[in-house]
Amino acid sequence: MLKIKLEKTTFENAKAECGLVFIINKDFDHAWVKNKKLLETFKYEGEGVFLDQENKILYAGVKEDDVHLLRESACLAVRTLKKLAFKSVKVGVYTCDTHSKDNALLENLKALFLGLKLGLYEYDTFKSNKKESVLKEAIVALELHKPCEKTCANSLEKSAKEALKYAEIMTESLNIVRDLVNTPPMIATPVYMAEVAQKVAKENHLEIHVHDEKFLEEKKMNAFLAVNKASLGVNPPRLIHLVYKPKKAKKKIALVGKGLTYDCGGLSLKPADYMVTMKADKGGGSAVIGLLNALAKLGVEAEVHGIIGATENMIGPAAYKPDDILISKEGKSIEVRNTDAEGRLVLADCLSYAQDLSPDVIVDFATLTGACVVGLGEFTSAIMGHNEELKNLFETSGLESGELLAKLPFNRHLKKLIESKIADVCNISSSRYGGAITAGLFLNEFIRDEFKDKWLHIDIAGPAYVEKEWDVNSFGASGAGVRACTAFVEEFLKKA
């Protein structure tokens, strides 16, 4: 992990092997730009990166005056620098538009530091010839790129320290998620997932309860159990329950995650090319583990419960079948018409378990539907639920964190598509359209009336796993949901 060191000095006087200068909105006239003629000669127009070897400065373009583009550019700069021979880099402090008047300096520092730190991530556990980055340190000169009010300048050091703490916690939490999701299914079984959660619990002094199939049977979590039937003798399921309890808790929050450690589709078998990357189907459950790490280290004033349903969905003599009817923990019967719509079965029972805790808000995370990716694209997560204020808060705070999110609306016509003639509800829709929403409506069937306005469903199927670098996301798992939900919890508690 890149070490960031804060120094009360100017950018010019800071000592490092290389300088990093951002060209914001094509402004080449700043004093930190050392060789404008060189940039003009090579027709560098303030996008991407350009290395001035003579002055040992890497220029990184920020296309518009936007804090999110600053974060992205910082990440790109570090990805570039780690391929070079520089051990250290220096950078000043920038203040781009945050689209909000509150804490602009702090938000810029968070974006800068997080971008720098996330740029070094690479999952190379199984590579024989690992190429360790030479770049080890970033010196941040506490000098502002452009004049600021005196109050802003006076709070620079304080804001930098707070932002650095945030970036370190968020990077660690995201990397926990990335590593877990990237770990191949031969290793990352439900038991392994529980072991990762136990390590996080031990480090943060959290309560943890890891329940096996006997507990699931006692609690009548038959939908969850059905998904695991083909794996029961080899990789049994685990219900993982993490608890963070601060001394002062304003609210109780339940975070629920789908933890499918591998999903071949069950008897409704996926085509071979669709199975590749299905190790990422534990993205929701992994995000919940990362969130408990982040929220505990940030010391949020809420009692937070993380509930992960960890299982495989495989084929075998005991596999559950299309035409089966399952009785969920909530007592509702489910007609199975497709065993590849399994995540919603696991979540149905986990959401029931979460409601037994009487939380003030429930948020579930799942790589639930390909339809969500078709509808919103691979960069955006979907938000569903009944409470408009809660949905708006998650969307606004999530967008400010740098994640992309959009709301999808429930409606009565789509709800009819999951009706069953022989059970209370069917696990798939009778139509090929609106699949992300009908999956959310299926989950809604297991939300009790008193929790309807306290529940949000987040489908992270698009951005949870990245096959081509974009923004601050390296190849592989992105940790989708962690930044957004952390910001949501902080804003939710401000209103408590």
From Swiss-Prot:
Cofactor(s) in the UniProt record: Mn(2+)
Family membership noted in the UniProt record: Belongs to the peptidase M17 family.
EC annotation from Swiss-Prot or TrEMBL: 3.4.11.1, 3.4.11.10
An annotated Gene Ontology molecular function: metalloaminopeptidase activity
Residues the record marks as active site: K270, R344
Subcellular location: Cytoplasm
EC class (word): hydrolase
Nucleotide-binding listed as a keyword: no
Catalytic activity entry: Release of an N-terminal amino acid, Xaa-|-Yaa-, in which Xaa is preferably Leu, but may be other amino acids including Pro although not Arg or Lys, and Yaa may be Pro. Amino acid amides and methyl esters are also readily hydrolyzed, but rates on arylamides are exceedingly low; Release of an N-terminal amino acid, preferentially leucine, but not glutamic or aspartic acids
CDD domains assigned to the protein according to its UniProt record, in alphabetical order: Peptidase_M17
A GO CC annotation given for this chain: cytoplasm
Name of the protein: Probable cytosol aminopeptidase
Gene name of the record: pepA
